[in-house]
Amino acid sequence: MIKLLYPQFWQERNIIAYLLLPISLIYQFLSYLRTSLACPVILPAKVICVGNCSVGGTGKTQIVIYLAKLLKAKNVSFVIITKAYGSNIKSTTIIQKWHTALEVGDEGIMLAKYGTAIAAKHIKDILPLINELKPDVIIVDDFLQNPYLHKDFTIVSVDSQRLFGNRFLIPAGPLRQNPKQVLDAADLIFLVSSNQDQIPNELTPYIDKVINAQIVPSNNIDKTKNYFAFSGIGNPQRFFLTLENYRLNIVGHKTFPDHYNYLQADLENLYSLAKEHNAILITTRKDYVKFNYLNNKIICLDVELSINNPDLLNEKIFKKA
């Protein structure tokens, strides 16, 4: 799997974006063809799909965790389906405590703490396990662009800082799909940000289904220490902004590609940088799950989702779910 950082031309158009535009048109045609020919699988439970229309982190994982907690509180049986990005998974697997991030993906390890989670590469392989588990609801993480799965309820996550970037499709831009098409079909839109004050113009036509959400720290970290931050997630800028808002003393940071599998050389380099700055290494939960054997040497910033309109979410979810 090719792992890319979010390039600047995905946010602001330049000559590179325009040079890549012909490939984006091919991508658009192939996506249309794939969707047109697909016959969606209807699973024997209500499917809540959490996705986005762009590449990079938009807070999907935190939304899935929020939904899992909500359904559990309401005594609704559910399972979570994750694509297991960054893993070497060969077959559909129910994630267990002994699994590693390399086996089932970093997101899989995180999500399994909140309910039964299945790591799957292909929709067709999920059905036997669903028939065995018999959940009332299936939360699907990042299958929005998959035309082979029927969705009963769709939540679209939008990062309020990046929004839709330069509005070009991959690879000229960050978009997987036309935003209007995605937003028109969505049941709910989560506008995810560390600082929110108003709805962007692009989302005002959908204001009745927009939920403002913040990703906020949920654990206590010593603010008298120096920290060197690193991450291998889709939107590292949000992580660094969260650290800044938490008023931690960040003396430096390093970014890796999304779902990055760290090498020993990477760790040695990070230790060296931290020592140079008399600092402690700090990272995201998604990265932290890859370092179980080093947890005493690395600090994790835990976060959770805080939303401004839980009543709207409850009304929509339990009306359909």
Curated annotation (Swiss-Prot):
GO terms for molecular function: ATP binding; tetraacyldisaccharide 4'-kinase activity. One of its GO terms (cellular component) is plasma membrane. It holds the Pfam family LpxK. It is an enzyme of class 2 (transferase). It catalyses: a lipid A disaccharide + ATP = a lipid IVA + ADP + H(+). Its EC number is 2.7.1.130. ATP binds at S54, V55, G56, G57, T58, G59, K60, T61. Keywords: ATP-binding, Kinase, Lipid A biosynthesis, Lipid biosynthesis, Lipid metabolism, Nucleotide-binding, Transferase. Pathway: Glycolipid biosynthesis; lipid IV(A) biosynthesis; lipid IV(A) from (3R)-3-hydroxytetradecanoyl-[acyl-carrier-protein] and UDP-N-acetyl-alpha-D-glucosamine: step 6/6. Transfers the gamma-phosphate of ATP to the 4'-position of a tetraacyldisaccharide 1-phosphate intermediate (termed DS-1-P) to form tetraacyldisaccharide 1,4'-bis-phosphate (lipid IVA). Belongs to the LpxK family. HAMAP family: LpxK (MF_00409). This is Tetraacyldisaccharide 4'-kinase. It comes from Rickettsia typhi (strain ATCC VR-144 / Wilmington). The gene is lpxK.
